[in-house]
């Protein structure tokens, strides 16, 4: 299962055939090009007045969108996802699609050859436009290389890419590519000589930074509503879900909430020979009655998780790849056992988990907002990797409603009295489902409790906090995959050693 796709402007059967040498999938003719969709990819299409609408991927908040469209059209209750977005687009305009959540790309193939493209806003399905021998639109750059060969993509110098900088959410290290701005409408068109270009505008204005000082009880009620909403949408489809469970607040809270919605929970904990959090995860599993599995990862498995995250999610940032390693190892462990997985990922950026208890911050909300924004280009929320393991990955914290609620929330709810994530701990405590020592346990990073960060450093011969070295290695692997010089099916230790030593 994969939602990878590409559109080639003025393409031909030959382009599709070239891709099919490396990737299973099918091609479909468009008004002025071809669409390629990987095998078993989730896609739907429908006819509308402007042309043919395509939805690649899935909607997460379908129930909400049906209720919205149903105000005007009863047919919304019978519509598939593509028809639902087309209906909202027709009735309310492109801006209405800012309300849609999911790992999707929606586009309209118009008879004049233009493509009107709507990108989702949370980094679940990053989309690029590439100017190679031909013009491409894709959420998987590997497909362009498969079609045009090793020289299809041109890369920025390593020194420029591996800097600890804040970047625009359109950033990509591929010089002849443009990452389409998330949460925007784009028109891919061409000039009088046939050269393609992109016109873009955002679907919404930036959120207000005015301090939100909600009273405690209404705030707790909103957190409860917004965290449960995605679980309520999933419950009719899945009896069993999987959860990566560290025993920290976020994964434990998601497990507790899921225990109210699903018949069976499979929980997974990972560690290394250096350290693990099995004591805490087992405590939560016992309290909630989950089917719990624990696994010690070797350094080879840690590196394999990093390599897979680079390949599938096209990550070039060392920290993001390191964090994803644990998740990819859980995907492998859970493959065939569950088809849906829930995580606590993203909570730290909303509720202050990355802040240091007792530290003084002039504007903690600004610091958190910068890190939320950063996820729009890192690839860490991309769903390709989980999909390749047959898993529908969901992050209940990463919703429009909860992100907006927390954006300007009073900092005292996030860091106060030598503690962080205060309001989330209060909420978890109010459920009376988790042991108090879990609710008030000190924060440890997802990659730190299992010492994945140290294992990565050991393989590179570096120090645990040297993320420039980690990013250099990650970017080298990223380039090797996107040039077609490495294959995910037969990456060898000697190839990786060459990339580590290359300086």
From Swiss-Prot:
Free-text function comment from the UniProt entry: Involved in the biosynthesis of carbapenam-3-carboxylate, a beta-lactam antibiotic of the carbapenem class. Catalyzes the ATP-dependent formation of (3S,5S)-carbapenam-3-carboxylate from (2S,5S)-5-carboxymethylproline.
Subunit annotation: Homotetramer.
Gene3D superfamilies associated with the record: Glutamine Phosphoribosylpyrophosphate, subunit 1, domain 1, HUPs
Keywords assigned: Antibiotic biosynthesis, ATP-binding, Ligase, Nucleotide-binding
Keyword Ligase: yes
Any Pfam family hit: CarA_N
An example Gene Ontology biological process: antibiotic biosynthetic process
Reported effect, residue 380 to Q: Reduces catalytic efficiency
Origin: domain of life: Bacteria
Pathway(s) of this molecule: Antibiotic biosynthesis; carbapenem biosynthesis
Catalytic machinery residues: 345, 380 (proton acceptor)
Mutation effect (residue 443 to A/M): Loss of activity
Protein name: Carbapenam-3-carboxylate synthase
Annotated substrate binding sites: 346, 371, 374
EC number: 6.3.3.6
Signal peptide: none
pH profile: Optimum pH is 8.5.
Presence of the UniProt keyword Coiled coil in the record: no
Domain Asparagine synthetase: 228-443
Catalytic activity: (2S,5S)-5-carboxymethylproline + ATP = (3S,5S)-carbapenam-3-caboxylate + AMP + diphosphate + H(+)
Assigned GO CC terms: cytosol
Resulting phenotype, residue 380 to D: Reduces catalytic efficiency
Outcome of mutating residue 380 to A: Loss of activity
InterPro entries membership: Asn_synthase (IPR001962), Asn_Synthetase (IPR050795), CarA_N (IPR015230), Ntn_hydrolases_N (IPR029055), Rossmann-like_a/b/a_fold (IPR014729)
Molecular function (Gene Ontology), one example: asparagine synthase (glutamine-hydrolyzing) activity
Residues holding ATP: 244-251, 270, 344-348, 421, 444-446
């Amino acid at each position: 299962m994969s939602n990878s796709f590409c559109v080639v402007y003025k393409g031909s059967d030959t382009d599709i055939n070239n891709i099919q040498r490396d990737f299973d999938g099918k091609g479909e003719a468009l008004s002025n090009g071809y669409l390629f969709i990987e095998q078993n990819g989730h896609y739907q299409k429908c006819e509308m007045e402007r042309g043919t609408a395509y939805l690649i991927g899935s909607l997460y908040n379908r129930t909400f969108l049906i209720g919205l469209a149903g105000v005007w059209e009863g047919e919304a209750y019978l519509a598939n996802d593509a028809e639902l977005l087309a209906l909202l687009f027709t009735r309310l305009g492109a801006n209405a699609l800012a309300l849609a959540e999911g790992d999707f790309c929606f586009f309209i193939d118009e008879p004049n050859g233009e493509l009107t493209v709507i990108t989702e806003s949370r980094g679940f399905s990053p989309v690029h436009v590439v100017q190679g021998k031909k013009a491409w639109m894709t959420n998987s750059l590997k497909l362009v290389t498969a079609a045009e060969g090793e020289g299809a993509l041109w890369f920025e110098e390593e020194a420029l890419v591996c800097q600890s900088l804040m970047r625009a959410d359109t950033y990509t290290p591929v010089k002849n590519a443009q990452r389409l701005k998330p949460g925007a409408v784009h028109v891919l068109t061409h000039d009088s000589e046939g050269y393609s270009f992109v016109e873009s505008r955002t679907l919404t204005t930036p959120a207000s930074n005015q301090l939100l000082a909600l009273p405690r009880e209404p705030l707790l009620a909103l957190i409860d509503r917004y965290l449960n909403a995605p679980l309520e949408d999933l419950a009719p489809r899945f009896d069993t879900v999987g959860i990566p469970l560290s025993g920290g607040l976020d994964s434990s809270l998601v497990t507790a909430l899921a225990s109210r919605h699903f018949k069976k929970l499979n929980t997974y904990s990972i560690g290394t020979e250096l350290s693990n959090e099995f004591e805490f995860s087992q405590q939560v599993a016992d309290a909630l009655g989950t089917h719990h599995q624990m696994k010690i990862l070797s350094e080879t498995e840690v590196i394999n998780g990093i390599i897979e995250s680079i390949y599938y999610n096209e990550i070039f940032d060392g920290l993001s790849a390191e964090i994803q390693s644990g998740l990819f190892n859980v995907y492998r462990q859970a493959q065939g056992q569950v088809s849906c997985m829930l995580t606590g990922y993203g909570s730290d950026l909303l509720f202050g988990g990355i802040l240091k208890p007792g530290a003084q911050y002039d504007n903690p909300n600004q610091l958190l907002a910068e890190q939320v924004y950063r996820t729009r280009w890192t690839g860490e929320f991309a769903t390709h990797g989980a999909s390749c393991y047959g898993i529908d990955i969901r992050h209940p914290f990463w919703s429009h409603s909860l992100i907006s609620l927390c954006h300007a929330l009073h900092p005292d709810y996030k860091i106060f009295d030598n503690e962080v994530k205060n309001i989330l701990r209060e909420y978890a405590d109010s459920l009376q489902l988790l042991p108090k020592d879990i609710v008030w346990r000190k924060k440890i990073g997802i990659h730190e409790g299992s010492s994945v960060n140290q294992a990565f450093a050991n393989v590179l011969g570096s120090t645990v906090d040297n993320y420039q070295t980690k990013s250099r290695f990650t970017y080298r692997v990223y380039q090797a995959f996107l040039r077609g010089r490495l294959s995910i099916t037969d990456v060898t230790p000697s190839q990786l050693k060459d990339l580590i030593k290359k300086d």
